[in-house]
Amino acid sequence: MNRPQLINVVDVICRSFRHLDPRLISHGERVGYILMKMLEETRRYTPQEKHDIFMLGLLHDIGAYKDSEIDTMLSFDTDDSMEHSVFGYLLFKNFSPLSQYADVVLYHHNCNAQYYSVPISNYHRDIAKLIYLADRIDIFCVQNMEEDLYTFLEQYSGRIFYPADIHWFWNTQEKHHILEKMKSLEYREEVSDYIFRHSNLMADQTHKYLRTLTFSLDFRSEYTALHTDYAVHLSNNIA
């Protein structure tokens, strides 16, 4: 029988990535924060779906492992590379407790494509578009004046982002002052509090997140990826 986790594995993941490359997890935390506050203002999703979407936002770039690709991802370029999305898709699909959302991770930078090699439902595509909106808001505000965000979002309204989602963001911003809290770093305390209050995972879910973390770290080196794969198979055989 599963028992609640003894450690907060989400916090472990955040701390681990912060030591490796703080740029990615800081970006993920801000994207997760934007989504978290927006989801407080809707009844479109169940509490479990809201938490799942927060986790997707937090870890949406978990497949990034090359410094050059991280640099590209964190620049404001709408011609995004899919390489990190493919690795993220494989990690979520094969190891994480959110495997049903793997296609969301795969298409979070390409949610307006005309053809999808991996089928994606409208429900998941809407989530991917929402994550991409939060992603672009964060990247834009890191590199530009917040005052210019409105013009940017209007420029892509209807072409990349749903007008209703943009309106949803601005209503949430007016109520919760998301951008100001991100700039002052106050958001970190809210994210940390949310993680500790909502990440009450069962033992099997914790194990899956730890496997996701392990393999994501080892994607950074072909040698370590092969080593970990061999070690996992050997451990399973011994067990």
Predicted segments with their positions:
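Histidine- and acidic-residue-rich, metal-dependent catalytic cores
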Residues: N2-A239
